[in-house]
């Protein structure tokens, strides 16, 4: 039964980045392992990862993946923080993926975006993540205590 189901699936393409995201700098191999494990647990057919360019604020590989989204059931990445920071660009990418019948999976947040309604929730989550990472945490250093 699982073999027949796997044969009808287009599969899930993994997207990784060498850049830091959401305050993390995670090696590509660890990202790929995380994505593969997620797909195995969810019963998704895993396709090897693609790697984004190192150049900051460019998404050439992601854009290429968007153009081929109809070839997959889903695209999986570690975090919503891997998407472009610019809301209009992010919304355009996600909408074009959804329009091709493809879902977006985010393993750290454990969410799947499969509809425009989910896009609204995704935008709220991205706003919260951006807010939380922009806040400076107070330091409790003994060096700062006057003697």
Q: Where are the model-predicted features located?
A:
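Short, structured surface patches at the beginning of a domain
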Residues: 1-147
């Amino acid at each position: 039964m699982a073999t027949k189901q796997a044969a009808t699936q287009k599969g899930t393409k993994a997207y990784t980045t060498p850049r830091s995201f959401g305050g993390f700098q995670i090696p590509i191999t660890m990202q790929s392992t995380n994505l593969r494990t997620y797909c195995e647990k969810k019963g998704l057919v895993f396709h090897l990862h693609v790697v984004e360019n190192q150049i900051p604020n460019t998404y050439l590989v992601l854009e290429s993946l968007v153009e081929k989204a109809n070839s997959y059931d889903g695209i999986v990445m570690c975090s919503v923080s891997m998407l472009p920071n610019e809301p209009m660009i992010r919304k355009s990418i996600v909408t074009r993926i959804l329009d091709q019948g493809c879902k977006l999976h985010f393993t750290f947040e454990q969410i799947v975006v499969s509809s425009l309604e989910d896009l609204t929730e995704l935008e709220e989550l991205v706003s919260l993540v951006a807010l939380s990472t922009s806040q400076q945490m107070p330091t409790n250093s003994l060096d700062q205590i006057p003697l």
